[in-house]
């Protein structure tokens, strides 16, 4: 176990996750996560970072396994492309352009804007768009492009996210404030100049270097993938159990139907001798009738003989 932890720390070190900000820009609340000071820069304790990655990963895995969404937020230049790529890989919503004010606290209005984007798409599909004037089409196209840029990545988010993952909480302070107001759990890469007290799951790390961001985001995406895999496996096992539960019922019905058929066959076989008996009786009837005819003839002859004598 120690070897795995050391390997993880070495990878974090190679990615430059340990570099903090200048000592004069530090936030004293980050002191527990700072290992030392070197050349006027704070060095982050990577053993604590590794532990926090593990802790955050477990929580993210549970959220993903429950089928809820995690909203990724990163608008700084060196982070936006990496975060967008990782979020797409796990089919999660993300914001990499300017944070729309009220994105969480005024979610109903944001949803209306997203629906407006969908309406424009429908207009283009059914031909309504072409009935507009050239000027109107240009205005609609500009509006669609603006909405796509700011809200395109959250188009499928029909309700508030279950959690927020933020890169640089100081820069994304509006997003953090909105999440706090709505009691949405916050996961974040927290540098030495940030306040960790408002974050639920902090990952002390360098949030300025793209290599460091990529390393942390890869670990986060892997945790989310595990959760999604667990959810998929759970669904498959539930469907399998349901199918197995239905199978015995069908077998039982088949087994119950079999004796009925057998009974029908037996009844037919039992009925056969009765029919034979009826036939025998009918066949026997002429034999009984034959002596009766002889008796009648005998009586007729006797009567004729009596008349002759008279």
How does the language model describe each region?
Residues 1-7, 226-310:
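Intrinsically disordered, compositionally biased charged tails
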Residues 175-233:
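Short glycine/threonine-rich loop/turn motifs
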